[in-house]
């Protein structure tokens, strides 16, 4: 018996084989880990699940805190690069929560950092972003927290964005020990036309970021619902100002003048032919002339007329084509009508925004997390929207996902007003939803990518 057992190598090899199998199972290949991460359901890692985060954000004390923040910001709207008071509020709340931050970033911005575990900040870095600036509008909503700043209003929901990100900061800080990486929270200035995102990127505070997520309120969809889509989601956009100069004269003798108003009218009509006859019907493009300024007397043909507006496309190539043709058409009409023309695209003052393109993988990740937070019925596939967003600059740099989050309520709102309306209102039930979704998207991303960042 002793001789037969010592002559066979199988009993000795069996423990070694089992040990190798255990080691391989605990350290899969990077490709296998990545595939598992893409397939994993949301809420599978450490920390709170999406549903738990939403319950925490909806707790009476937490929700009341969010409402108070949003109302304070709403009463004191500030325009692009003027967000001094808003920035002070953000920093005060971060101090109270115990979250460190960098300031100033891009003049008035704040970038907070929540490092998981021991706070060393090793591993994957994920970013969340909210914009802070308001619009030059006089608020016409009659409620106790309306704007106290004449001619300024949060008519695009950036007060809600800032509040939701502060809520996410509080949730993430409470789950700090379970974070498998670092979350950066970007409180960004100057989204409304001044490309604040570009200035944030130029300062290098996001150079270590692996991916980014953002939300924007949408009154067209019901509160508690989000929409998005992979690929192009929001349009690229540019602005133009055309000036046509002729020869002024008496209205009774137009033959002695060179009429710039007629020239401008002809050019404006022809601009729409770019969309109607030069653009593929399956590709979205918009040219909108939004103002025209000429003389101020009934009986005088003015010497010059100016007009301008925006142009938009879902591709960079489409935007470049629109820009080229606007210039050609305005100048050609001026020549035909014996006028001169200049077209200014104001790119130094107002940088054109690229299209916001959702990364396929990041979209799938954010959608899965949103389903975990809101349920399948709360997550819809959206259609492309011809509005533009400087979040696009982040999306050019990192894998990004941008979602619209509903603030409409058919039950409580007599009428739904669009973004940028002086009558725009927000259903504040969105605040805990956005806070929880921000936090869940970040936490689950770090859970999924912890292996590739630390192995």
UniProtKB/Swiss-Prot annotation:
Question: Coiled-coil regions in this chain?
Answer: none
Q: What does this protein do?
A: Hydrolyzes certain amino acid conjugates of the plant growth regulator indole-3-acetic acid (IAA).
The protein's name is: IAA-amino acid hydrolase ILR1-like 7
NCBIfam families given for it? amidohydrolases
Q: What is the lineage of its organism?
A: Eukaryota, Viridiplantae, Streptophyta, Embryophyta, Tracheophyta
The stretch of residues making up the signal peptide is 1-25
Q: Which PANTHER family match?
A: METALLOPEPTIDASE, PUTATIVE (AFU_ORTHOLOGUE AFUA_6G09600)-RELATED, PEPTIDASE M20 FAMILY MEMBER
Which UniProt keywords are listed? Answer: Hydrolase, Signal
Q: Which domain of life is it from?
A: Eukaryota
EC number annotated for this UniProt entry: 3.5.1.-
List the molecular function annotations (GO) for this entry: IAA-Ala conjugate hydrolase activity
**GO biological process entries:** auxin metabolic process
For this chain, the family text in UniProt reads: Belongs to the peptidase M20 family.
Entries under Pfam families matching the protein: M20_dimer (PF07687), Peptidase_M20 (PF01546)
What organism does this protein naturally occur in? Oryza sativa subsp. japonica (Rice)
Q: Which residues cross the membrane?
A: none
- Can the keyword Signal be found in this entry's annotation? yes
């Amino acid at each position: 018996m002793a001789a037969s057992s010592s002559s066979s190598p199988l009993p000795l090899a069996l423990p070694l084989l089992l040990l190798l199998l255990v080691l391989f199972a605990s350290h899969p290949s990077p490709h296998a880990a990545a595939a598992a991460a893409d397939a994993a359901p949301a809420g599978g890692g450490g920390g709170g699940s999406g549903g738990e985060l939403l319950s925490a954000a909806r707790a009476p004390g937490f929700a009341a805190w969010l409402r108070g923040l949003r109302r304070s910001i709403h009463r004191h709207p500030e325009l692009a690069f003027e967000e001094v008071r808003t920035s002070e509020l953000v920093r005060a709340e971060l101090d109270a929560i115990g979250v460190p931050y960098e300031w100033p970033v891009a003049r008035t911005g704040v970038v907070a950092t929540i490092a998981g575990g021991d706070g060393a900040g090793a591993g994957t870095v994920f970013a969340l972003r909210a914009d802070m600036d308001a619009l030059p509008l006089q608020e016409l909503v009659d409620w106790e927290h309306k704007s106290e700043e004449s001619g300024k209003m949060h008519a695009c929901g950036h007060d809600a964005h800032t509040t939701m990100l502060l809520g996410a900061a509080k949730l993430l800080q409470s789950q700090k020990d379970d974070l498998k990486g670092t979350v950066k929270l970007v409180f960004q200035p100057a989204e409304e036309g001044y490309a604040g995102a570009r200035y944030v990127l130029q300062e290098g505070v996001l150079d270590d970021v692996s991916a980014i997520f953002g939300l924007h309120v949408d009154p067209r969809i019901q509160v508690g619902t989000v929409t998005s889509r992979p690929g192009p989601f929001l349009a690229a956009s540019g602005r133009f100002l055309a000036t046509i100069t002729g020869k002024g004269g008496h209205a009774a003798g137009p033959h002695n003048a060179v009429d710039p108003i007629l020239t401008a009218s002809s050019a404006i009509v022809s601009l729409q032919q770019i969309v109607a006859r030069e653009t593929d019907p399956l590709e979205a493009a918009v040219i909108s002339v939004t103002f025209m300024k000429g003389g101020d007397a009934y009986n005088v043909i003015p010497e010059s007329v100016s007009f301008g507006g925006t142009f938009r496309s879902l591709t960079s190539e489409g935007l470049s084509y629109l820009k080229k043709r606007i210039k050609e058409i305005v100048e050609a009409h001026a020549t035909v009508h014996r006028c001169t023309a200049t077209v200014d695209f104001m790119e130094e003052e107002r940088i054109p925004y690229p299209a916001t393109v959702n990364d396929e993988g990041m979209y799938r990740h954010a959608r899965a997390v949103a389903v975990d937070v809101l349920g399948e019925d709360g997550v819809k596939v959206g259609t492309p929207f011809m509005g533009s967003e400087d979040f696009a600059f982040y999306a050019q740099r990192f894998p990004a996902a941008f979602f619209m989050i509903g603030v409409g309520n058919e039950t409580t709102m007599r009428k739904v007003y669009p973004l940028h309306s002086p009558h725009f209102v927000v259903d504040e039930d969105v605040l805990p939803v956005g806070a929880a979704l921000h936090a869940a998207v970040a936490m689950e991303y770090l859970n999924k990518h912890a292996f590739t960042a630390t192995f």
